[in-house]
Amino acid sequence: MNTEKISTTVPGRIFIRMMALIMESRFRYKFFGPEEILESAGIHPNMHVLEVGCGTGFFTIPAAKMIGQGGSLIAMDMLPESVATVKEKVKQANLSDIVEVTRGDALNTKLENKSLDEVIIFGVIPAPMLPMDKLLEEMHRILQTGGILAVWPPSWVHKDIIHSGRFSYIDRRKGVSTYRRIE
């Protein structure tokens, strides 16, 4: 069962609400501050970034502020509830000129080839509906040569990313593993 179908069931909706509460908890902000994690991913001004699985927007607003007016952030999620929540947060933060919030599929983003500086995948993997081979193929397609793929956590996907032949390992800081797109 995929994420979209899960969100239409009563247990699925309850699970999604519980996860949203956890994602927005003060504990998470205190011990897993989004700014520190984004800095470890190498987010900086003027970048063009895709956030896969934006969820509640925990990383979206801080990332947009770090990227600034010269860059752009596409916050993508499959769940309409997540998209609506993040759109409202972006509007309230006055960041609509930097952030595009969209409902979409990470396996088929419909973005242009080599159009992004970085893709961040934070807290999405391991999702059973995201086959790593197809996900990595799509991320490789949309990243510029030398573009960055940042994954937070888990570390066990490292082998899949390296064995794909599409990315080379850069480093791991504050739990964020970064990889460079290769031809």
Regions found by a protein language model. Give the residues of each.
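Conserved alpha-helix/loop element of class I SAM-dependent methyltransferases that forms part
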Residues: 28-45
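Conserved SAM/SAH-binding beta-strand->alpha-helix loop
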Residues: 79
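Conserved SAM-binding strand-loop segment of SAM-dependent methyltransferases
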Residues: 95-106
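A short acidic, Gly/Pro-enriched loop at the edge of an enzyme's catalytic core
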Residues: 107-119
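A short SAM/SAH-binding and catalytic strip from SAM-dependent methyltransferases
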Residues: 117-131
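A short glycine-rich, Lys/Arg-flanked "PGG" loop and its adjoining helix->strand segment in the class I
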Residues: 133-145
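Conserved beta-strand signature within the Rossmann-like core of class I S-adenosyl-L-methionine
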Residues: 146-153
